[in-house]
Amino acid sequence: MALSPSVVPQESEENNANCVETKQSQTASTASEDPLQHLCLASQEVLHKAQQSGRSRCLQCGGSRMFYCYTCYVPVENVPTEQIPFVQLPLKIDIIKHPNETDGKSTAVHAKLLAPDSVNIYTYPCIPEYEGQDHEVVLVFPGPQSISIKDVSFHLQKRIESKGGDKADDLDMPPRKLVRTEAQEGWHLNESMGKGPELKRVVFIDSTWSQTNQITSDERLRELLQVELKTRKTCFWRHQKGKPDTFLSTIEAIYYFLVDYHRAVQKEEYRGQYDNLLFFYSFMYRLIKEARRSGEKAKQKPIH
């Protein structure tokens, strides 16, 4: 089911400008209280109503779900599709889900619901073929060889240049002779590769951290450039004990990657273009936070 872009407000440019001003005025204290409060989000009234009315039927499989069906990747009956925001992304997103990952606990489905034209979800061992594309595809995952987003273009360019060197080896010709021959034909190696490195696709892993090694060590992903979001912190309510707060949930990783890519690589001011990726996540975050707060108050209430 395609999600309608019609819910994107016509005054989005004005709203985005207001969001920028609001975010710039954000203080450290309020950020720690609610790190998601300054997002530029579509109205969540539809989620409030759905939460009050309870679980609803998936129109595809008939299952009873809250907000959306995590197996069919569609909103349920009491969450009209036209009231869900549609997010346009600058890159294609591939999510590789561990087979033992619990569907109902995963945030990967949020990305598919909100950016259906740009996001695909695969269940391991099903992985797309990336051979020959390692100069335009990166894997977001922390590790000793991982780089920061601001260095992505530099490392992709190095891979392009490396492929050019491989071409000389394949032709079994001395490099100088190869360059001279190409110049005579009016062809330049860099031009054949394009004006510069262009990232086209980003791969994310949807799994508990204890299960990720099986996927990251797969030979089909081993050659991809690894990128780490080193400065972002999670506010996921299922954060795994013993792991640093820089280990993000899947939807957080996708969102923060795109924001940092927009600023560091595209060199453009961020005006909330991708905030609606956290449409479901931010609502559930506040819902769970309030439930926990109410539970704590109930425990503190004196018994007479």
Swiss-Prot record:
One GO BP annotation of this record: tRNA modification
EC class (word): transferase
Superkingdom field: Eukaryota
InterPro entries: DTW, tRNA_Mod/Golgi_Maint
Reaction catalysis annotation: a uridine in tRNA + S-adenosyl-L-methionine = a 3-[(3S)-3-amino-3-carboxypropyl]uridine in tRNA + S-methyl-5'-thioadenosine + H(+)
Example of a GO MF term: tRNA-uridine aminocarboxypropyltransferase activity
Localization (cell): Nucleus
Disulfide bonds: none
Region (Disordered): 1-30
Segments of skewed composition (Polar residues): 15-30
Keywords in alphabetical order: Nucleus, S-adenosyl-L-methionine, Transferase, tRNA processing
Known EC number: 2.5.1.25
Motif (DXTW): 206-209
GO CC aspect terms: nucleus
Family: Belongs to the TDD superfamily. DTWD1 family.
Chain's role: Catalyzes the formation of 3-(3-amino-3-carboxypropyl)uridine (acp3U) at position 20 in the D-loop of several cytoplasmic tRNAs (acp3U(20)).
Name the UniProt record assigns to this protein: tRNA-uridine aminocarboxypropyltransferase 1
Lineage: Eukaryota, Metazoa, Chordata, Craniata, Vertebrata
